[in-house]
Amino acid sequence: MKKGLLAISIIALSSITLLAQNEIDALRFSQDAPLGTARFSAMSGAFGSLGGEFSALSLNPAGIGMYQFSEFSFTPSFNLNSNTSYYGDKETDYKSGLKIGNIGLVFSSLRENSEWKRINFAIGWNQLANYDSNIRIQGENNTSSIADNILAISQGNSINELNTLYSAPAFWTNLIDLANNSVDTITDSYTHDNGNYISHVNGNSSKTQTKNIHSSGGKNEFIFSIGGSFNEQLYLGATIGVPTLDYYEKSTYSETNFEDTINGLQGFDLHEELSVYGAGLNLKLGAILRVSENLKLGASLHTPTAYSIEETFSTSLTTHFIEESFTERSNTNHFEYDLITPWKAILSASSLLNKNILLSADYEIVDYSFSSMHSSQYTFTDENNVIQKLYTKASNIRLGAEINIKPFVVRAGYSKYGSAFANKDYSKENFSFGLGINNGGYYLDAAYVLSQGNGEHLIYNEDYINPVSLVNTNHSLVFTLGFRY
């Protein structure tokens, strides 16, 4: 019997596959993976004490005081991302695309009769994270089904009380059913609407489980910087950052090739769609001290970013039986909340050797357990408790080198971003290389960046299934064209 459509008004605040408004969002939007200009990228972002580089204004704004000319820079990049999953089968999926890493304008002014030799201003835009990726997961499972998860959260609820994102679509497409689904022919209503449900999937029989996840978007920051040089020895600066979030995720989870089902179910597809938009505000303060002609030290402090975020989330479920298929779509759920990201502190040092070899290093510390979520619609008590228990303090290291071999400049870098998890090592490494030509009035730089890291994805509730291991690899080609005037 095909079930009719019933209006459901319950708003579900969380996804059984952990997609919306939870600790995963808090971590995703708290982490940075800056790309920026080609010079910045080629040296793996180790610019905390170097200065004179637009992307560095999102790290240590004191570097603006080292500009001796006004400057414009523009950076496009090409990215190829791959994700390999290990869930019985080894699956690899790819995504490529073009991004803008930087657009920046610096205004430099010389003050000849003042100890503050320069007061400089900058306005522009830096890329802080790229969310483009495709993930494919596939394997055989004879111990559980996502239908078991849906059945568990449905039990004890009448039809009108079913979760609108998962339980109600599962019921109206016959993935789950009332244990006694007798219908009163006069009232056309169920006679045993008592919250006792059964699943049409035998979780303990063999089946193929497949999930495809397509993500896109990024985190970018508009910056407004001011800074100066005191006797060309002490450099101070401040940046007001206005980061923006744009994240879209669409996933399809399928179960097929059932060894044993009920009522002739051949398979089903669960679609989830998440859109996130947000904007925030932060302040960055920094200082660089020229200890000697060949040594500079830097320090900077980033306040938490206060984000206002709006999410929309919806699902649809299609079941395939021998004779027909059924599809049911949830309403689109709109949700607004605030996210507070952690403080960040950076210590830096750089040295110039033989006037043509530049070495630099940054040490950065950020405590991801500081993140918190807030809303007038929901308390987020459980999510904030999970953030404090699950996440920890992470140390990030960036190393860079530059050799001037006229007319070219050769650069290389390495960085390691520590794991945000208290009990799991999901650190990330970057290896980079680049070349540049500096002709005084203009410069042209190119860089290649290889990023590698491990992670995991939970297909559905961890009470039923273990997380799937992921290996993420990203290749970036970055080009910057700049003009000085």
Task: Indicate residue ranges for each PLM-predicted region.
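Outer-membrane beta-barrel translocator/receptor signature
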Residues: 38, 50-59, 65-142, 220
